[in-house]
Amino acid sequence: MNSRSLLRPLLACSLAIMAATGTLAAATLEGIVFSAEPGQVFVPVDEAAEALKWNVGRDDEGKVFQLNDMELRAGSLRTLTDGTELVSTDMLARAGAPVSTADEKERIRVGRLFRGFTLRISPQQVEIDLAKQRLEGWQGGRLVLQTRISSGRNGRTPAGDFRAGPFRAVMHRSSRYNNAPMPWSVQIHGHIFVHGFTSVPNYPASHGCIRLPLDEGNPAKFFFEWVLSDTPVKVK
């Protein structure tokens, strides 16, 4: 029996022990999907790079310009409203990571045995708290959006369990209130929309819609591009 034959059972035993103790357990990260980019799955750059053990190059403003050995245009990556830069699975593949197709449980394997992670694609959900005047957007257990809002004054925003859509528009205009502009509009219930507005005080001030800021990272645009049609929207 040669040395290679002797090593095989030892290696198999070592791998079994490592798997049992969690040494081989790859990180599982919550993926982020966007209505504006169907078929793409995103993850924060730093989380992906740490799991893949890749170097990340940043400019003086902290923007990523190099991922592994692939150069990027600084500031070209999609971001969360807090500035967290995201990278898609397509871009990870171009940068050198093997990327599987999603399995029946909506999981994608990125990377190799000792350098990689599992990307889980979980359902979206939205929670709007009228008392706190806050909106939160979740992808599984990952909080992807947290922003202040201004809801309808005098209780004009109904509470309940709704769904995003079916109507949405980059620029909608109110059919009830003097053709008022409603950028980044997503319908959630009848004439109630989540949309951007120039004035978003920290108290109810609208005719019933949910106003989101157009500054502060533009959560109105982010929500429009992120939320999928039929995503549950809970208003309480």
Regions found by a protein language model. Name each.
Residues 64, 88-163, 170, 229-236:
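Intrinsically disordered, low-complexity
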Residues 2-11:
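Bacterial N-terminal signal peptides that target proteins for export
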Residues 22-123:
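Primary recognition of N-terminal secretory signal peptides and signal-anchoring hydrophobic helices
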Residues 157-161, 171-236:
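Exported/periplasmic cell-wall-interacting domains
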Residues 34-45, 81-85, 128-131, 157, ...:
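Solvent-exposed, acidic/flexible segments
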Residues 10-22:
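Bacterial N-terminal signal peptides
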Residues 39, 68-71, 141, 190, ...:
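Residue-level detection of beta-strand-connecting loop/turn positions
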Residues 42-49, 89, 93, 132, ...:
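Extracytoplasmic/secreted envelope proteins and their assembly/folding machinery
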